[in-house]
Structure formats: C-alpha cells, structure tokens
Curated annotation (Swiss-Prot):
One Pfam family named in its UniProt record: EF_TS
Molecular function terms, GO-annotated: translation elongation factor activity
Protein name per UniProt: Elongation factor Ts
GO CC terms, sorted: cytoplasm
Annotated stretches, region: Involved in Mg(2+) ion dislocation from EF-Tu: 79-82
Amino acid sequence: MAISAAQVKELRDRTGAGMMDCKKALEETNGDMELAIDNMRKSGAAKAAKKAGNIAADGTILIKNGEGFAVLLEVNCQTDFVAKDANFLGFANSVLDVAAASKVALEDLKAQFEEARVALVAKIGENINVRRVEYIDGAKLASYRHGERIGVVVTGDADDETLKHIAMHVAASKPEYVNPEDVPADVVAREQALQIEISMNEGKPADIAEKMVVGRMKKFTGEISLTGQAYIMEPKKTVGEFLKEKGAKVTNFIRLEVGEGIEKKEEDFAAEVAAQIAASKKA
C-alpha cells in the first residue's frame, strides 16, 4: 500500500516523531494509523522524539587507542545522574568500539545506533545524543581523561611520561593551537585590530602604542598555544622550554570537554516546583 504525505504528516503531528520514522511505521502497518502509533509507542520512537528538544549538555567523554590512532567520543545526556548510569555508559562504549574499529564518520555512527539510542531514551527518560567523534593519528600518542568530562590525546616525539604530562596540561589549560605560529592569520588580525583600538583609546603616542601592541600580541598567541603557555607542573617554564629540555616535540592534540558550546538552560527550581504543584491541582 502506498503511503501518502498526508498520512505521514498526520502521524508526525500526533506523535512528534521524525518523517522517516512515521513513514516506516505506516508502511509496516499498511497505513493503519492507530496501529502505527501503538507500535511507535512500544519501540520508544514517540517518546524519544518528545525528548529530542531537551538540551543534552551533560554526558561523558570516552577515549580508545587503535593502531596508530586514537578516537575521542562525546555522548550527551541531560543530567550528571544519567551520565553515571550503567545503561548510558554501556551505550556510549558500544558506539566507541564501533568508531575505533574502522574510523566511522559521525553521521554514520548516529544512523547505526539510532535504534539503540531511541530505546535508551525510552528507558531512562532523557534525551541522548552522540555529539562528536574525533580521530587523531600518530605513531606515538598519550591519552588522559579528567573524570568523565574531559578527554585529551596528544601525539608527538617524546617518552610516554612526557606525553602523558603534556596531555594533563592540555586538559587543565585548554590551548587552542600547538605553537604560536599556528594561530591563523585572521585570528591574529582580529586581535591586533582590537589591541590597536585599545591603545589609541588609552591616548598612547603612536610609537608607544605600536610597541605595546607587539608585546600584547606575543602574549596573546602564547596564551592560546600549547608551547607558549606556562607549564602547569613547572610554572616558571613554558611548555616549549620544558619540551626542549626533554628533547621532545608535540605534533598535535585534541581536547574534548562535555557540553562545550552548548547553552545549558538555567533552571529556576522554585518556579519548577510551583509549576508541578499547579499541574497536579489541575489533574
């Protein structure tokens, strides 16, 4: 039986599920709307769709080393309670294993685990999202996890202990680039324009302002690059100086932190309780 767009729309309006999920459900029931809804409820698709709008800014970062590479994975949920749940962590580790086995792209991972994700959402009652997967190549690498929320992998030419310590530094200090010279030209230009404007507003003579900007730019690129930062274990040295003493070099790193860039909704607890009380009175 051919399924019409109107039928798909009606099922979508009634369940909140995605178009493809609705079409599939209707095809499986030969267009029987009520049976399709019942089946979707059983599978959890309708419940997962309702949760999809909820902000998932908590979760975990996982790391796994492969042959000459490592994979970092972020899987999100809504609360730190669920982030520690065995079912959630089991799901996240299953995704990690598949990613590490063949460097699967994010969208392919999402598609492969969508059915399991929907079932998990229905079971635990929170939105779940496979948000990021990153791969980093290197003959020699070290990884570090700070709790469940921060993961770092560093590659380079150094002994295991040195690379491990650098990974810990990256976790704490959040550098954006390996070296000051790696900072993109547009980032440098934007900051330089800002510093020139600040110096002019301070009323400095042009020659003094120019020297001040040079110094500020050196500080700026140093603070956002790994080798220019003060080394957390020996703050009187930069990371670059520490690496030079060790005859070591860092070639690349990746740092992931749970919820980066996600605007988490601020909950008003009192208002939430009041709303629940009001809702219970209407029931």
